[in-house]
Design a protein with these regions (language model features):
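Short, Gly/Pro- and small/polar-rich lid/capping loops
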Residues: 490-492, 666-711
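Single conserved hydrophobic/aromatic residue that forms the stacking wall/gate
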Residues: 1-12
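Short, cysteine/histidine-rich loop/knuckle motifs that typically chelate Zn2+
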Residues: 839-843, 857
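Internal maturation/activation junctions in enzymes
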Residues: 93-94, 254-257, 357-404, 408, ...
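Function-dense linear segments that define catalytic or interfacial modules
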Residues: 76-82, 96-173, 181-184, 195-198, ...
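Conserved, charged catalytic cores of large soluble enzymes
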Residues: 10-87, 173-187, 197-309, 340-344, ...
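Terminal amphipathic helices with adjacent charged low-complexity linkers/tails
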Residues: 237, 298, 303-305, 315, ...
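Catalytic alpha/beta core of large soluble enzyme barrels
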Residues: 42, 318-320, 372-373, 377, ...
Length: 864
């Protein structure tokens, strides 16, 4: 009886409300209870307590385990459901959420629904922009302010830079010519890094059209060490550019990019710029590529472009292309949970239950829009009550008014999935094969039809989104696909409309998948088996010492199995508690459906084709990373990107292995040649006349500085630092990242150090007398640091030495921090940061990785 069920829900609501309002738990209490909830999974428990348990501004914790959180969410969604016909009860909703089994609100909805301790949005992501002409300084600063205002409310932000004039364009101010895109990329990046979000940095996506004359500078911007570190960058590629790049033809850039009669045009060699995109992606994983014509052609909201729904950029992870001032909330359906008898010969996918839950997921997402509108009303009320004068508050207030209008008018949702990799394995299908891809396509077609059918049903009960117009949409390729697959659904939609302008996405589900204990999004398993290390006391009983570091600390290596790999083992009679040899582990993996189906060894071209086939049933986009081994060449990246474009993908990102090797240790056995015993590093006291050198730029207070790091056999041997400006400092093109430091002796015996570099055409330029550029105080400290580098003190110890210098001058201390950052990039990946504790989990398990500190226990990272 639904009335009885609703009554139970109300009882739970009162109980949970009292817990949330009155009971305060210590971190240890919440962690221990969550550890029991996740059946001993320390990482899942820690992530939940740190990121998702309700806390007030003093750090008091009001939820003991995810059970409390799920009741909090269920009660709030049930409150909205009670406003509409056939409302779901809190108990019915709780059963969908419990243990992250079926439906999982992601990120901001999980944290914010029913949370009265923070005034924040429920939206995961936003896109902002300016209507009309937007190339003025005022427009650029306006975007900067809006970006910060959204990030302080937990939102990730995306915006496009194609409206900014190219470098050298005439402007009617004291500068006379435009500075171009790159300085503003740095500005927006710095703003992102300033905004703390519960200890996180802000998330930012910057995009630009390949048609923009400054797009090459945009593509290169992050290749300079320390530049634009607070943003992801993606380049919007149109079909004309891709065709020209593939065929080796010229391509015309212009500004404004959409003008029929542009003020500026430039013909370029498309294949040369394409090679640069490929090279940079191969080297640094950026820029990502967005196939913009495909995005616009397939976009249902762009059928209403003239009403304010013209897509201009994407959210930071790329799965939601958005128009200015629209936002989206995310939810994932756990695909693994619909496999009956997983990993058994009679395993099958329960499509009947799945279809029912897809409809409910879309319904819950629509309820969350109502909850979001309430949250925005609360944000605007707080702005009104803040003591600042109206002029100061106006920009933030107007921003939220625009978002409120777009959210209510279009009612956009982001229903997605997670655990695709585990679902396929549980059915005995190998990720990346044709058979697996066909099944995935069937699943995502079911999601699309189910979500749109649910949206049409809600239109009958609750009303369609207010600007729905069938005639506008009738030629949209996605809508035509739905109509062909389900004519009855399309007929109903024409008659009643639908509740939501767009419904679907596939987002990365990083922390979500930790709590579902599955693979992430549509990705394959990263590793089915990996190793971690923990420090042990060798005198304790039952301790197995596998590794002793140079300080004498003992460590035990232990095998960690992917959760669903354990399920496969148990289903096939293998004991997960046994201590296996490396050979036995290799044999186990080879017998499992995860064999040759990990992120590093899946068939990459097939993965791209799979993404394209699934994309046909996702109205927004898909966030996917193609993980590649370190030794692949640039040609493979080229082939993957071209295949992604041809297959109908809306975007693509590649990531070459190496950036997180300090977190997970592959258990693959590799025979290595016997190395001779270690010997002390060779000290070269007589400096060679010429040393290769890296150029590292950094900020010292408000001044721009540059460091020249001389290298001997790849190891830092000396460091020179100085101002970088046009007058008395060092004038050096931004494109210069390496060169040579040459030691010269003048006729009077005076030593001099010169820096020499080559430009793109091979011509050499020499900057004489580096030491003459220095303040003597900096020069003396640089000599000290160079001395310890020359005698091969370990880099991490040099950094510790520099950090311990007690200096009175604030500018010297800022310079010191810049030197530390410059040297960190030379620390060997995996080097332990001794004596440092992870600020996230408190363990002394930090290692250096590409100049950043990464925790091998919880995965937290900190750079700079």
């Amino acid at each position: 009886d639904r009335s009885v069920s609703r009554g139970l829900g109300d009882v739970y609501k009162r109980q949970t409300h009292n817990i949330v309002e009155k009971q305060i738990y210590s971190y240890d209490e919440a962690y221990e209870e969550s550890l029991r909830y996740f059946q001993g999974d320390e990482l899942a428990a820690r992530v939940w307590v740190n990121k998702y348990a309700v806390k007030d501004s003093f750090g008091n914790i009001y939820e003991k385990s995810p059970e409390d959180m799920h009741w909090r969410i269920a009660n709030e969604v049930a409150r909205i459901e009670s406003k509409y016909p056939n409302g779901l009860t809190a108990k019915e909703l709780y059963d969908l959420l419990d243990h992250f089994k079926y439906i999982v609100p992601q990120g901001s909805p999980m944290t914010g629904i029913g949370n009265d301790y923070q005034v924040a949005s429920l939206s995961n992501c936003f896109v902002i922009g300016v209507d009309g002409a937007a190339d003025s300084y005022g427009a650029i600063i306006k975007i900067d302010e809006e970006q910060v205002q959204l990030m302080k409310r937990r939102g990730g932000v995306g915006h496009d830079l194609s409206h900014i004039r190219p470098k050298g364009s005439p402007v009617k101010n004291s500068a006379l010519t435009s500075t171009g895109l790159v300085p503003f990329m740095e500005r927006y990046s710095n703003s992102t890094r300033e905004v703390a979000q519960d200890g996180r940095r802000g998330a930012l996506m910057l995009s630009v059209s390949i048609k923009h004359p400054d797009s090459e500078a945009f593509i290169d911007a992050k290749m300079t060490e320390g530049k634009v570190t607070g943003a992801n960058v993606s380049v919007k590629l149109d079909d004309a550019f891709m065709q020209a790049a593939v065929e080796g033809k010229p391509y015309v850039q212009q500004y404004p990019i959409d003008a029929a009669n542009p003020a500026f045009t430039k013909e370029i060699d498309a294949s040369t710029l394409w090679k640069k995109i490929v090279h940079n992606a191969w080297k640094s994983a950026e820029p990502g590529v967005l196939f913009w014509d495909t995005i616009i052609r397939e976009s249902v909201p762009d059928c209403y472009a003239d009403l304010g729904y013209k897509t201009v950029s994407t959210n930071p992870c790329g799965e939601i292309p958005l128009c200015p001032y629209d936002s989206c909330r995310l939810l994932a359906i756990n695909l693994y949970s619909y496999v009956v008898n997983p990993f058994k010969p009679d395993a099958y996918f329960d499509f009947d239950l799945f279809k029912k839950h897809v409809a409910l997921a879309q319904r819950i997402m629509d309820d969350i829009i109502d909850l979001e509108l309430e949250k925005i009303e609360r944000i605007m009320k707080k702005i009104d009550e803040d003591p600042e004068n109206e002029e100061v508050k106006r920009a933030e207030r107007v921003l939220w008014e625009k978002i409120y209008k777009k959210s209510g008018q279009g009612r956009r949702t982001g229903v997605g999935i997670t655990a695709e990799g585990d679902m396929l394995a549980a059915l005995g299908l190998r990720y990346g094969t044709e058979e697996a891809t066909e099944f995935s396509e069937k699943v995502h077609k079911t999601v699309a039809l189910g979500a749109y059918r649910s949206s049409v049903e809600m239109a009958k009960e609750r009303g369609a989104f207010e600007i729905y117009n069938n005639e506008r949409e009738q030629n949209n390729p996605f809508i035509k696909r739905l109509a062909e697959a389900d004519p009855e659904l399309y007929a109903e939609m024409k008659k009643y409309g639908r509740r939501n302008i767009a419904c679907l996405t596939i987002a990365p589900t990083g922390t979500t998948s930790l709590m579902t204990q599955t693979t992430s999004g549509i990705e394959p398993v990263f590793l089915p088996v990996y190793k971690r290390r923990r420090k042990v006391n060798p005198n304790d009983t039952n301790v197995h010492v596998d590794f002793v570091d140079e300080t004498g600390d003992a460590f035990e290596e232990y095998i960690v199995f992917h959760h669903k790999f354990v399920t496969w083992m148990e289903a096939n009679g293998y004991d997960p508690a046994r201590r296996y040899t490396q050979e036995e582990i290799d044999e186990l993996v080879a017998k499992s459906p995860y064999y040759k189906a990990t992120s590093n060894d899946v068939d990459w071209l097939m993965k791209v084709k799979m993404q394209g086939r699934i994309q046909k049933w996702v109205d927004h986009s898909i966030s996917v990373t193609i993980n590649l081994p370190n030794d692949v060449d640039e040609d493979l990246v080229n082939r993957l990107y071209v295949e992604a474009w041809k297959s109908g993908c809306k975007g693509c990102t590649v990531y070459r292995d190496g950036s997180r090797s300090g977190v997970l240790i592959s258990t693959k056995s590799e025979k290595k040649e016997e190395l001779p015993p270690c010997k002390p590093p060779t000290v070269v006291e007589v400096r060679p006349k010429v040393l290769e050198a890296d150029v590292v730029r950094f900020q010292n207070n408000k001044e721009k500085w540059v460091a020249f790091v001389g290298l001997l056999d790849g190891h830092p041997y000396e460091i020179f630092t100085g101002l970088q400006d046009d007058d008395e400092g060092i004038l050096l093109p931004k494109s210069v990242t390496c060169g040579r430091i040459i030691k010269n002796v003048d006729e009077d015996g005076t030593k001099r150090y010169d820096f020499q570099f080559e430009n793109k055409r091979g011509y050499k330029t020499t900057i004489e007398g580096l030491s003459e550029k220095f303040n003597k105080e900096y020069w003396n400290y640089a000599k000290l640091i160079s001395g310890v580098l020359r005698y091969r003190m370990p880099i991490e110890q040099v950094i510790k030495l520099v950090g311990s210098l007690q200096l009175n001058s604030e500018s010297i201390n800022t310079w010191k921090n810049g030197v530390e950052r410059a040297l960190k990039k030379y620390i060997q990946d995996g080097t332990e940061a001794k004596g440092k504790k992870c600020p996230n989990c408190g363990n002394e398990t930090l290692v250096y990785q590409e100049g950043c500190l990464i925790c091998t226990t919880c995965g937290a990272s900190r750079c700079g």
